Amino acid sequence: MISKPDKNKLRQKRHTRVRGKISGTTETPRLNVFRSNTNIYAQVIDDVTGTTLASASSLKLTGTKTEQAAEVGKLVAEAAKAKGVEEVVFDRGGYLYHGRVAALATAAREAGLKF
């Protein structure tokens, strides 16, 4: 019997492959996105020191999932700019650049982050 491929395992493989090629530095940290079934999380990470500089999530937000993602993008961009971060490397976490991930990225760009 043919078994259905586990989408999350495939996503994790993509994410691991991409993480081997990109990393955040102190000057240009990494904007990481995690998307669950109900929420979306974003954090700005300095991979050299292994610290999270800014983060935001949709845990307490209301509206559609896409609207929540856009609000998270705006919030994480504002938090990053408050820490002095202007430019980041976007890490979509193995997810397709579509829907909620694209909405988060667009809102972060509009709020002033460069990537």
From Swiss-Prot:
Biased composition (Basic residues): 10-20
Residue span of region Disordered: 1-24
Matching CDD domains: Ribosomal_L18_L5e
GO cellular component: cytosolic large ribosomal subunit
Domain of life: Bacteria
Entry's family note: Belongs to the universal ribosomal protein uL18 family.
HAMAP family in UniProt: Ribosomal_uL18_B
Quaternary state and interactors: Part of the 50S ribosomal subunit; part of the 5S rRNA/L5/L18/L25 subcomplex. Contacts the 5S and 23S rRNAs.
Name of this protein: Large ribosomal subunit protein uL18
Gene label: rplR
